[in-house]
Amino acid sequence: MTPQPIAPDQSEVLLRVIEAAPQVCRRHQFFVWTQGDFQRWLPHKISICGSYDRDQRDVVFDIFNSIPLPDAVVQGLRSIRSDIVQAGLTAWRKSRSQAAVLSLRRDVLPQPLSLALLELGYDQIMVHGLTRPGRADELESFFMFAQPRAEYGEATQQALDMLLPCVHMAYQRVCVTERQMGQARTGAQAAATSRASLRLTGSPEK
């Protein structure tokens, strides 16, 4: 793929996206970040984001969509074993771990999930990812971007190539923050339950 020149106004867009990224720590902040200048750099209505979870020892996916989607589609896109995610991984690996375009019509066998997306106007999906440090065959993160009737080309692939490190770092930070907050809430709830149990049994608290 031959690098395409970037217009000055687009360079400013990319700079603003990168400058805003360090403020992204929560799931809702990630969604808001991808709806501003990010859209001018990489237009999309759906983003499917995966990150390796060391507790589950697998890549766990989440979906961010700015327009409504059927629940079955949302749940299907959250699974690493779905036909679309697997086809996206295959397309990415065939491109030697560079940004790639997945076509649902061309690259995915007709299945309920892909047919539902095609009916909604989705065909092309931009995909990209990173492998775990020192483990080239294991994913660290994976991203898929789509919008209805999109025609993604080399310019869009280059845009995602340039933005990937920033997206990766922002989403990793979100995953770590959300996990820590979830663990803190679980710990607080367990402590509250324990205190309530002690009060009911009349046992003295230590």
Residue ranges and their predicted role:
Residues 150, 159-180:
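Signal-transmission/dimerization alpha-helices at domain junctions
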Residues 173-206:
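Signal-transducing coiled-coil/dimerization helices and immediately adjacent hinge/linker segments
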